[in-house]
């Protein structure tokens, strides 16, 4: 059984503006989601990949990967919530999703051996310092160290340098959580399970990625301001 010592944080609502996701804080402030902020960093590689494999193949892979990732994430969340032992009939529903369930089965021993004392799961967070928000997968002890833990699926094993955006995102969650609760989190953990059953563990210190977080937020803010200027300019032209 996993031990839960969950910290209370306020719920956040979401709002889409110009196809970008924002979170509204209890004080009424709108902050972009960290995934939206980091989208630009991923775009060049994605565009090149789409060009290489073709749009139809790319769309199929993206759809199946998103479905698989969502299912595995839900299984991890429910397992850490002790559903398998406390609500076996509900847990049995997961077995209907064969491939995600098999992938989760590879992750399960890692969760059992290394994760405990859970502080939060699927939790909305924000930071006034960085003016960004998001939803974290899991905050818990990993090998006895308080950590931001993110679950990922992949078709093949990932090189460490492919994960930079993951590390920046997890570092942002660490900053958000400390600002909201006063609990410092320095370790970030990305767990990746591949279709051939390999589990990769990437353990980092958030300090290395905070400068990159600031850079990504500055880039997003600059682009967002330019985009809004163009919208306002077009509106003024129509009005005249």
Task: List the model feature ranges, each with a label.
Residues 119-230:
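Mg2+/Mn2+-dependent nuclease catalytic core
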Residues 1-133:
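Metal-dependent nuclease catalytic cores that hydrolyze phosphodiester bonds in DNA/RNA
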Residues 8, 13, 33, 85, ...:
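Generic serine detector
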Residues 1-10, 226-240:
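Glycine- and charge-rich intrinsically disordered segments
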């Amino acid at each position: 059984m996993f031990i839960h010592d969950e910290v209370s944080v306020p719920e956040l609502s979401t709002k889409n503006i110009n196809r970008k996701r924002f979170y509204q804080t209890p004080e009424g402030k709108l902050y972009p989601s960290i995934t939206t902020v980091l989208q630009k960093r991923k775009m060049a590689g994605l565009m090149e990949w789409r060009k290489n494999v073709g749009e139809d193949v790319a769309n199929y892979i993206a759809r199946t990967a998103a479905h698989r990732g969502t299912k595995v994430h839900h299984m991890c969340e429910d397992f850490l919530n002790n559903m398998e032992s406390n609500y076996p009939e509900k847990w049995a529903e997961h077995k209907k999703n064969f491939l995600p369930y098999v992938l989760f089965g590879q992750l399960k021993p890692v969760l059992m051996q290394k994760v405990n004392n859970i502080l939060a799961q699927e939790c909305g967070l924000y930071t006034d310092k960085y003016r960004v928000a998001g939803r974290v997968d899991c905050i818990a002890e990993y090998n006895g160290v308080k950590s931001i833990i993110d679950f990922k699926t992949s078709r093949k094993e990932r090189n460490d340098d492919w994960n930079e955006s993951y590390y920046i995102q997890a570092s942002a969650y660490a900053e958000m959580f400390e600002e909201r609760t006063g609990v410092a989190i320095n370790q970030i953990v990305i767990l990746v399970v591949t279709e051939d059953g390999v589990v990769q563990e990437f353990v980092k210190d958030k300090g290395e990625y905070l400068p990159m977080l600031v850079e990504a937020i500055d880039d997003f803010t600059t682009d967002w301001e330019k985009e809004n200027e163009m919208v306002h300019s077009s509106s003024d032209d129509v009005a005249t």
